Design a protein with these regions (language model features):
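Catalytic histidine-centered segment of alpha/beta-hydrolase-like enzymes
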Residues: 247-256, 260
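Conserved serine/cysteine hydrolase catalytic core
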Residues: 178-234, 240-243
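Conserved alpha/beta-hydrolase catalytic His-Asp/Glu region
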Residues: 129-132, 144-200, 205
Length: 275
């Protein structure tokens, strides 16, 4: 297991410096190959009442990129260190896709720190086929690109049938010192993340939690099938399922207003102890 100093993690906190009574901070965890700015449409509508933390998780964005150590537990331990550094006693966990697996592991390992869990298009079933998909995807992109125009043209031409994914990947390019564009994440770490996070079933871990949980599913998502979502919603008390029509896997980006509304309502109910 590799150790990342929480002080070296790139993060931003939006909202009040003094925590209002009977509220908890919100932690937004991006998905695989994502970064903190992915939540740019969400935190502005949440931070008026409570602090909202966004961060680049290990191997992503501006945070440290160890050669190995990309299990859900590695990510969760990083977050625990950061939460303790900030002096927070409890927080709401919100995770998209891979970030959902991290949030789930955090709640499982440190239940005393978790006020609630929200999984955005993030299921508990094993998906070992995603390992090969990620390997082939990363191998297919001819990084580094000479300039941003070349990169944009390549993603436009090769993701005509999936412009949302193409745009997401294009946003994950950064300019290197030599002027060329390359991934802002550690590619081998992304493969290890999928190998350790999606190749195994996490249903028992999810069912063992005892905190209020919101499942947000994109109505057209293939990543989080309706049958799997219903199975998770029915496995224990305190699990609530919201399906947002017209959204795919990136619910918070495709239907930001609807996603934020569902999340904010859930957080209010948790803090008012009405669920």
């Amino acid at each position: 297991m590799s150790i990342v100093d929480p002080q070296q993690l790139y993060y931003r906190i939006h909202g009040p410096e003094i925590l209002p009574k009977d509220t908890y901070p919100v932690v937004l965890l991006h998905g695989l190959m994502g970064f903190a700015a992915n939540w740019g449409k969400i935190w502005p509508d949440l931070h008026a009442r409570r602090p909202v933390l966004v961060l680049d998780q290990r191997g992503h964005g501006k945070s440290p990129k160890p050669k190995t150590g990309y299990t859900p537990t590695d990510y969760a331990k990083d977050l625990k260190g950061l939460v303790e550094l900030l002096g927070w006693t409890r927080c709401h966990l919100v995770g998209h896709s891979m970030g959902g697996r991290v949030a789930l592991r955090f709640c499982s390992l440190y239940p005393e720190l978790a006020a609630s869990l929200t999984l955005e298009d993030s299921g508990a079933d094993a998906r070992p086929e995603r390992v090969l998909w990620i390997q082939e995807l990363l191998a297919s992109v001819p990084t580094p690109f000479s300039n941003r125009e070349e990169a944009k043209r390549w993603f436009t031409d090769n993701f005509k049938n999936d412009p949302i994914t193409g745009g997401f990947l294009h946003a994950n390019l950064e300019t290197r010192g030599d002027g060329k564009l390359d991934w802002r994440f550690h590619a081998p770490g992304m493969i290890e993340t999928v190998e350790t996070g999606r190749a195994t079933d996490a249903m028992r871990e999810f069912a063992s939690l005892k905190i209020p949980t919101l499942l947000v599913r994109g109505g057209t998502s293939k990543e989080f099938p309706a049958k799997e979502a219903k199975h998770m919603a029915d496995c224990r008390k305190g699990v609530f399922l919201v399906t947002i029509d017209g959204a795919g896997h990136y619910v918070h980006a495709e239907k930001a207003q609807e996603f934020t509304k569902a999340l904010a309502l859930f957080l209010e109910k948790v803090e008012h102890r009405t669920i």
